[in-house]
Each structure stands twice: as C-alpha cells, then as structure tokens.
C-alpha cells in the first residue's frame, strides 16, 4: 500500500494521538509524508509502511515513531522578553528568600531553552552580586533531541544570531571547528558550568501524572508545545502543570497559548506571563 494514501495518514494520526496526545490537523499531509520518510530511515525498515505502523501499534519501534513525528522548532532566547522578566523581576524576588530556586522547562527540545534559562540565571547573579542557587529540570518526549541537548553542541553560524546584545556567548560556550561538506564549520559547545545546572529527562506531557511533588517548582516554562494538542487536552495538561507550581510561582506560555480554565487562578503580569495566586479547585 502506498504511504501517501489517506488510510496511512489516518492511522498515523491515530497512533500519534494515542502515544503522545498530539493532534495533527487536516492540512499536515506534506509534513506527514516527510516524517514517514524519516520514520523509515530511523527504523531501517524496508517493508510496507502499513505493516510498520501495525508493528508500532503492537509496541515495536515506538521510540522511533515518536522521535520522527514530534516537532522541535526552537532557538536560544526565543521570545526573549520572558528571559528579561526572569532576570529582572522573578530572580531578584526569589533571591531574597535565600532558598534554592526550582525551574521546570517542560518542552526542552534540543536544549536551547533550558540553556537560555541557565544563562539568564548567571546574568542575574552578576547583576545582583548574588549567588542564587538554581536547579533546572528539562523534559521532552523525544529521546533524540534530549541527547542533542545533553551534548550541548550547536552551529555557531545559526546560534550567534539568536543571542540578545547583552549576552556574550564566549562566557558560556567553547568554540571548536569541524569539517563539513561546505568546508570548515564553527561549532559552540555549552560549558560544564551550565550543564551542571540542568537535569534532562524524558517525559510525556500527556501522561496521567508527572513524577514531581505538588508545588515543587517556583517557575515553569511551557512554551510553544500546547499548540500541538487539542483544546481539551491543553486544558488537562495545564491543570497538571499548575499542580506542581508554587503559589506565587511564575508560568510562562508561548505567544499563541492561553490558560483557559485557569485564568481565574492567576495574575497576568506580562505577555503570557502568569503568577499563580491560588490552587485550582
């Protein structure tokens, strides 16, 4: 059976939803075709695509399937006003308590977001002449991007354009070169002092519960990932996230995401920046 048929696409949508909660809209056929080709490469599979999907349904190649169909668009300091808020409002307030600050980056992708958080903490410590101790939990469902994030190696030609003017990349990255098809390529590698601040773990936001304590986190970043879920599932995920956020803690959402049922339990202090005022009942 040809893998461009609607039957195959419908089966992929059903599988993706059952395994991750991610909903693919009707206009994603070209994307699905490209991801199918990636799936076949990842599985090193030479048979019929429908047979492969049946194997995935039976529990084989599940990791390869998830890694092939999740979207990982990100960059350093994306929506940089959130990092300015973290540096100029949140961290100065939390530094007064003298307690360790706990941050959850719930859609780590290839690591640019959690490393941007870590850099922001370092910058805040310099500005405040303080030593705020921070632990960052960075999670994602895609094991391949988590490994990329742990390695912490990025192309300089792309990444150098992503840093705000007040960030000096050489403080936080080591430069190195490697040969590529187009000649010598400059890479940057995250320094160990940043890596030590972050723990990377696999986590499916669609899981019924998360392996964290109630009110464990002072800050949660959940940006540009809810858009891949249905409105109903977005609401469910937000309520689960909310359970793990301290009262008075800050939640950052992506520019096109909203709090839905939780809007009456927070105070908005900026563009998709929310302070939790009370628990959801």
Q: Predicted segment positions?
A:
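Core SAM-dependent methyltransferase catalytic element
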Residues: 219, 260-281
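Conserved AdoMet
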Residues: 2-104
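A short glycine-rich, Lys/Arg-flanked "PGG" loop and its adjoining helix->strand segment in the class I
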Residues: 235-247
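A short His-aromatic
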Residues: 228
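Conserved beta-strand signature within the Rossmann-like core of class I S-adenosyl-L-methionine
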Residues: 248-255
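Extended basic-aromatic, gly/pro-enriched interface segments that bind polyanionic ligands
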Residues: 132-217, 221, 225, 233, ...
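Conserved SAM/SAH cofactor-binding pocket of Class I
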Residues: 93-164
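Residue-level signal for inorganic ion chemistry
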Residues: 86, 220, 245
């Amino acid at each position: 059976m040809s893998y461009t048929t609607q039957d195959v696409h419908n089966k992929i949508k059903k599988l993706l939803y059952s395994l991750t909660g991610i909903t693919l809209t009707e206009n994603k056929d070209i994307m699905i075709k490209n991801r199918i080709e990636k799936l076949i490469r990842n599985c090193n599979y030479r048979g019929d695509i429908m047979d492969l999907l049946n194997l995935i349904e039976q529990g084989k190649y599940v990791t390869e399937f998830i890694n092939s169909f999740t979207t990982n668009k990100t960059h350093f300091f994306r929506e940089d006003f959130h990092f300015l808020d973290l540096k100029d409002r949140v961290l100065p307030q939390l530094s007064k308590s003298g307690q360790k600050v706990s941050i959850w980056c719930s859609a780590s992708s290839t690591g640019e977001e959690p490393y941007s958080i870590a850099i922001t903490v370092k910058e805040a410590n310099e500005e405040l002449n303080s030593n705020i101790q921070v632990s960052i939990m960075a999670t994602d469902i895609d094991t391949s991007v988590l490994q990329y994030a742990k390695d912490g190696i990025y192309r300089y030609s792309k990444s150098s354009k992503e840093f705000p003017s007040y960030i000096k990349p050489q403080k936080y990255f080591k430069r190195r070169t490697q040969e590529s098809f187009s000649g010598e390529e400059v890479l940057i590698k995250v320094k160990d002092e940043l890596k030590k601040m972050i723990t990377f773990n696999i986590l499916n936001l669609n899981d019924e519960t998360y392996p964290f304590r109630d009110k464990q986190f002072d800050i949660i970043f959940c940006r540009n990932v809810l858009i891949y879920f249905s409105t109903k599932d977005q609401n469910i995920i937000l309520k689960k996230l909310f359970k793990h956020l301290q009262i008075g803690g800050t939640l950052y959402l992506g520019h096109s995401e909203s709090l839905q049922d939780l809007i009456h339990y927070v105070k908005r202090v900026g563009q998709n920046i929310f302070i939790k005022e009370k628990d959801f009942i």
